Amino acid sequence: MSIIPSFFGSRRSNVLNPFSLDIWDPFQDYPLITSSGTSSEFGKETAAFANTHIDWKETPQAHVFKADLPGLKKEEVKVEVEEGKVLQISGERNKEKEEKNNKWHRVEFSSGKFLRRFRLPENANVDEVKAGMENGVLTVTVPKVEMKKPEVKSIHISG
């Protein structure tokens, strides 16, 4: 039991320790901002969207790109081929969330964008690219063109 009262909330604290992480949070009971300084999971969701990772897997038949885009509609995603050999995957999300209580009213607006470009190899058939979205996972398949092996002609050596 400490003889020094805790001025920093109901948790036990050591006010004399300069390295103590138990500090007073003026926003602890305020509904708009959490103790970490961010405003709910709403903004974190958009930040995760903006940092979207895309996996590129090469199979014997095709190059397959997979992007995890939870909560995104296929209308919010673009898949394009630029300059014949650059695959571009992009998306944008704008979201609004409103909460009302008898003490406060909160409206949050959030938006996020992502853009990824991949230079495709020479064996990519950009005329046959297919894309599909299922359960928040975008799959882009770029088939491979069968590369013709150079014809080798034997030359008879005389002499």
UniProtKB/Swiss-Prot annotation:
PROSITE patterns the record matches: SHSP (PS01031)
Keyword Cytoplasm: yes
Gene3D superfamilies hit by this protein: 2.60.40.790
InterPro entries named in the record: A-crystallin/Hsp20_dom (IPR002068), HSP20-like_chaperone (IPR008978), Small_HSP (IPR031107)
Assigned keywords, A-Z: Cytoplasm, Stress response
Pfam families for this protein: HSP20 (PF00011)
Sequence similarity: Belongs to the small heat shock protein (HSP20) family.
Record domain sHSP: where: 45-159
One GO cellular component term noted in the UniProt record for this chain: cytoplasm
Quaternary structure, from the entry: Forms oligomeric structures.
Name of protein: 18.0 kDa class I heat shock protein
Localization, UniProt: Cytoplasm
